[in-house]
């Protein structure tokens, strides 16, 4: 693992040096004319003709949590010894830009703490209505997962994310926006992926993952993938999205670590599980108010044991800058709340999981420098109608530079 990290570090160092050298040594460009700026993507080097650009950004996330940091997954998690933690939760290095043409773009994201290459992709974005992406990235399926953990409204994602996310996959995606600024303004994403999780260059059988997402920009304005209305939208901006995915593999769930299995699934035989899932999603921002909601359904067919299981879940999340109506409230302060409900098996009505969350965000410099304090309450009930509850408190400082 140490050697692997060393190779990755060397690769990134060579990549950074090489990109700057290419920009500086291009025959048609004098190195003295290279533009150096500090943007919302970190430091950026670019040529006057905009055909070459290179930006680099570092991101750190410090977190204090008690009695535990992670959301409980099973009833046994409620009985674990309390472990108050203070840690660097995330440390990322982001590199991106364009080469040869402004519309030929690239992006890399490296997890410094874990030594993992999270994202690597090339994008052809010459036309707004049709774009192509190849490589590895967070699958465009659910809003909560696509939004960067550094641009979320709460400290982290809800309990809904774990069972329903498609996370990072490798493959190809076709996407674009059609009929912009009209009542028929739509954004679409169609993906063909390996379906085996992060870093998996091949699938476990001959079945690929297929994902589709159709988003209606209902007011003729596209809503960015960020939490909180820090830009203070003067005009109402909202979306209604539908997404679906199908995959056959030896996994029933995915995470940043790759493929894995939900509780109750223990074997990993190639092609054992067929997973079909879908969601309906809404989001809205207007004058300091923000809203987002997802409703999920997922069906897992186990071909080895001849069983079927259906999972459902949803969350609602909203926030507001109360300084817009109350003079004594500081402008950088936002208050947000979340409720999530998850049913691991729709055939077992007694079993459910609930999460309540309340967050206070203080924005020093939008999402690039913010402090969040959050209190959460979990209430889980099992098949025997036995209930277990727990409170959690977290403080997090998010900074990018």
Where are these regions (language model features)?
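Surface-exposed coil loops of outer-membrane beta-barrel proteins
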Residues: 72-80, 127-215, 222-233, 252-265, ...
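Bacterial Sec-dependent N-terminal signal peptides
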Residues: 1-28
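Beta-barrel outer-membrane channel/assembly domains of diderm bacteria
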Residues: 24-128, 172-179, 186-188, 264, ...
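Gram-negative outer-membrane beta-barrel proteins
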Residues: 64-70, 103, 114-118, 140-144, ...
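Outer-membrane beta-barrel pore domains
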Residues: 27-31, 35, 234-401
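Hydrophobic, lipid-facing positions within transmembrane beta-strands of outer-membrane proteins
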Residues: 41-43, 54, 89-93, 118-120, ...
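Short loop/turn motifs that connect adjacent beta-strands in outer-membrane beta-barrel proteins
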Residues: 45-54, 100-104, 129, 141, ...
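Transmembrane beta-strand segments that form the barrel wall of outer-membrane beta-barrel proteins
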Residues: 99-118, 134, 188-196, 292-299, ...
